Amino acid sequence: MAIVLDGKCLCYHGPLLYEAKVLRVYDEKNQTITSKDYKDVSIDDEKVEFDRPPEHMRQGQCYFVHYQGWKSSWDEWVGLDRIRPYNDENLELKKSLVEKARELKNNGGKKKSGSRPVGRPSKVEKGKKAASRTSNSGSGTNTSASSTSASNPASSSSSGTTAAASSSDKSDRKKATPVLNKRSHPKIHIKVPISLRSVLVDDWENVTKDRKLVQLPSERPIEHILSQFYADTSNSTSSVVEQAQLSEFLQGIKLYFNLSLGKLLLYRLERIQYAELLKAHSEKQYTEIYGIIHLLRLVTLLPEMMESSNVDDQTAKILVKQCDILLEWIAINIARKNFPVDPYINTSSQYEGVALSM
């Protein structure tokens, strides 16, 4: 059975094949798009509103597909490397890929050295614990039990894995960041407003308990948020020095985010999504794709990052002050609904099985 408009197909999303429906077909020779509602419409025709193929896919045949049972936010263009005809042979392949994924999940403890078994917290999960301590001591208040749970995902896992994960966390942290034990300046505290702590707790529960993902690309990416913050904040000071410091601070935030996203800021469930976004938006910086949730994850980890670097005390004080101002500004704008928190989307059981075994 060939791949036809409005017909069934199978598409790779990560390592698995999923049933999908072809909504649009792109003809690379004529640079046109065909759907149920229109035929051979030029890709440059602005009168017709539709999602166009990314630039890097326009040199070949591609299809706009909807994954059966998934929300339309997952609809996307796929090339010939990811799409397969809906036939018995490929259905068998789909089945075998699912079985292999299950085997990998069940034998997680036998994976190659250096991989993280299911149940072990990722670096962002470890970071939530440190971020919670930082925000608590900076604000002088105690968090609720749910906040404690969010800051330490291992505490919500089975009792058999909690102690091992805790011990392993300490060992991993010593190996990864030896400088943390040799601080030459006082411990750095950032004041995280209570409302933002609640956002981070909800974020942890949505991803780790409810198996949801932040909907990406964000409607208000970090680039937009920080540009708005600069516009609002720079107007309140006439000091050239302070404006220069603010600009440098925001450039540093963007740099930190783009460098640390894949290493520090993602839960395991998010890694397939991350790989897909990287492939679909290779021309963009992460700050142009991710939004407020991931920015908050970064800012709450900045104390640890600063402590492990060679930042002098004076610079650290300036950075802490700017972080406090940024977080307060974010809290106010969320409360005023100037920009909402990014929505979450559900994942399929197959996606979860593969993502959590990585």
Curated annotation (Swiss-Prot):
One of its GO terms (cellular component) is NuA4 histone acetyltransferase complex. Residues 132-168 have a biased composition (Low complexity). It is found in: Nucleus. Residues 103-184 are annotated as: Disordered. The keyword Nucleus applies. Pfam families: MRG, MSL3_chromo-like. GO terms for biological process: chromatin organization; DNA repair; regulation of DNA-templated transcription. It comes from the Eukaryota. Its main location: nucleus. Residues 184-356 form the MRG domain. Residues 8-84 form the Tudor-knot domain. Keywords: Chromatin regulator, DNA damage, DNA repair, Nucleus, Transcription, Transcription regulation. Component of the NuA4 histone acetyltransferase complex. Involved in deacetylation of histones, chromatin assembly and chromosome segregation. May act as a transcriptional oscillator, directing histone deacetylases to specific chromosomal domains. Component of the NuA4 histone acetyltransferase complex which is involved in transcriptional activation of selected genes principally by acetylation of nucleosomal histone H4 and H2A. The NuA4 complex is also involved in DNA repair. Belongs to the MRG family. This is Chromatin modification-related protein EAF3. The gene is EAF3.
